[in-house]
Design a protein with these regions (language model features):
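Ferredoxin-reductase
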Residues: 1-38
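Short, high-confidence coil segments that cap the C-terminus of an alpha-helix
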Residues: 11-13, 172-175
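Gly/Ser/Thr-enriched, mixed-charge loops and adjacent short helices
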Residues: 28-168, 172
Length: 175
């Protein structure tokens, strides 16, 4: 969601996310986003495919050194300031209307698993800023790993993918 949001925030023509997603490892790759921050439609993908098919791979492809593309502004990294705005935007959508004192008086205890994806830093950052400091992370699924060694189909909608998190819940008894 960070890149999708950043495409709109930065006014980009599009974005590409190299991803491990929440799909099995053979489906890892990239996701292309349009200027609206949404993944491109099948129509847009077909138009891109047609343009690629109509291009001579030896003479019709424009190329640029990566460092030169960065220096010219054609390639942009998502910088910390963009991430900070993203975290602020996520927090602004929060339904939490409790004061800091109320949060401190009734702390929330959570178990979280990023399923070997990239959610650890943004999720724990937003939770901490919302006053949630007691977060136990599933250790085997904490670090990003596109091979997903702990669950072959790391989609949180599939119960088996969440089994390690469920097991940890039974040990630490979160709220």
């Amino acid at each position: 969601p960070t890149l999708s949001w950043a495409v709109r925030d930065l006014g980009c023509s599009g974005g590409i996310c190299m991803t491990a997603s929440h799909n099995p490892a053979p489906y890892n790759g990239y996701k292309a986003y349009g200027p609206d921050g949404c993944q491109i439609t099948s129509q847009a993908a077909a138009a891109i495919s047609a343009a690629i098919a109509g291009t001579d791979a030896f003479t019709g492809v424009k190329s640029m050194d990566f460092d030169g593309a960065v220096a010219s502004g054609k390639v942009k990294w998502i910088e910390d300031a963009v991430l900070e705005r993203y975290y602020d935007a996520v927090l602004a959508q929060s339904v939490n209307n409790l004061s800091d004192e109320q949060i401190a008086a009734a702390p929330l205890k959570l178990v979280y698993t990023p399923l070997n994806g990239t959610g650890l830093v943004p999720v724990t950052t937003v939770l901490a800023r919302a006053g949630v400091s007691d977060v136990t992370v599933v250790p085997e699924q904490e670090q990003p790993d596109g091979n997903f060694p702990t669950c072959p189909y790391p989609n949180p909608e599939i119960r088996e993918a969440m089994q390690k998190g469920i097991d940890l819940c039974e040990q630490v008894h979160p709220d």
